[in-house]
Amino acid sequence: MEMEERKLKILQAIINDYINNGEPVGSRTIAKKYNLGISSATIRNEMADLEEMGYIEQLHTSSGRKPSDKGYRLYVDRLMEIPSMSVEEEMLIKAKIIDSALYEIDKLVKQAMSLVSEMTKLTCVVKSLSARKSYIKSISLINIEPNMILCVFITDSGMIKNSIIRVKSNIENSSLERIANILNSKLKGLTIEQINLEVINNIKKDLREYGHIFDCIMPNLYDILREADSTEVYKEGTMNIFNYPEFKDIEKAKEFLSVIDDRRILDTLFNASGGVTVNIGNENSIKEARDFSVVSSVYKYNGRPLGTIGIIGPTRIPYSKVIKVIMEVVDQINNNLDKMNNS
């Protein structure tokens, strides 16, 4: 049944007030603070209907109402307005998520995680997706000092790893380029399982007197492929939960911290598959997380999902602000990853 406009406006006012103040909302508060053009008595009757419909709930007979999970869902789907970013906020996002072709993806994403936590005042979580059977896309070798070479490895999933190796004698740039060409011709497209003894011996044979260079490179090569084949979970701003007075309660705080410290739970909660996903309270599949909301989105490299970034907090988070921040940050991550791919 379609809810009438007046009830929607009252519900919107209740949720906005509860998000901002964390206190149950009464009809007199709505009548005074929100210019709805109706009396407190009418609002009270409408609130009784909203409670009966399951959109708000009353904690005690003498208290006002607070939104239910069902109420928040209607709010997110139909009532909230996504704000525009200020120029200062847009500049902050672009400045923090650095654009650099040699910038390692995990560092870029960790910067984005810190930024989301800072801008939303909530706990931000990043889950890097498992890139099973990752392979080498390219290897670059650069002289940086006498007897020191910078090795840059890039996998198909966009992971970049920089390593410095020391060599016994200086190597000319032309020789270094030839070594890199041989390595790329032999290793490009190979997974860690495919780099077997036969491949290694063939590379050393082609490198001749520079075979020792490959011995120095191999451990780093294996490291990046192992890293690309694993799933990592990072978090930032855990203590931000204490910005919400209700989490001064030791039991509620312990409940939240136990969720944040459980990698299995975070791995399940942060499973967005496309654009921004919002899971509210009981919509979370994990029982321990049913007092919280999770807002997350996938970031991509070359069109391929590379990880999930999002926040977890109480159900009264400022949804419109959080969704906008995550949308903008993910767009900026994707733009930078695309530039890396084209560089």
Curated annotation (Swiss-Prot):
Keywords: Repressor, Stress response, Transcription, Transcription regulation. GO terms for biological process: negative regulation of DNA-templated transcription. It holds the Pfam family HrcA. Gene3D superfamilies: 3.30.450.40, Heat-inducible transcription repressor hrca homolog, domain 3, Winged helix-like DNA-binding domain superfamily/Winged helix DNA-binding domain. SUPFAM superfamilies: GAF domain-like (SSF55781), Winged helix' DNA-binding domain (SSF46785). InterPro entries: GAF-like_dom_sf (IPR029016), HrcA (IPR002571), HrcA_C (IPR021153), WH-like_DNA-bd_sf (IPR036388), WH_DNA-bd_sf (IPR036390), WHTH_HrcA_DNA-bd (IPR005104), WHTH_transcript_rep_HrcA_IDD (IPR023120). Induction: By heat shock. One of its GO terms (molecular function) is DNA binding. It comes from the Bacteria. Belongs to the HrcA family. Negative regulator of class I heat shock genes (grpE-dnaK-dnaJ and groELS operons). Prevents heat-shock induction of these operons. PANTHER family: HEAT-INDUCIBLE TRANSCRIPTION REPRESSOR HRCA (PTHR34824:SF1). This is Heat-inducible transcription repressor HrcA. It comes from Clostridium acetobutylicum (strain ATCC 824 / DSM 792 / JCM 1419 / IAM 19013 / LMG 5710 / NBRC 13948 / NRRL B-527 / VKM B-1787 / 2291 / W). The lineage of its organism: Bacteria, Bacillati, Bacillota, Clostridia, Eubacteriales.
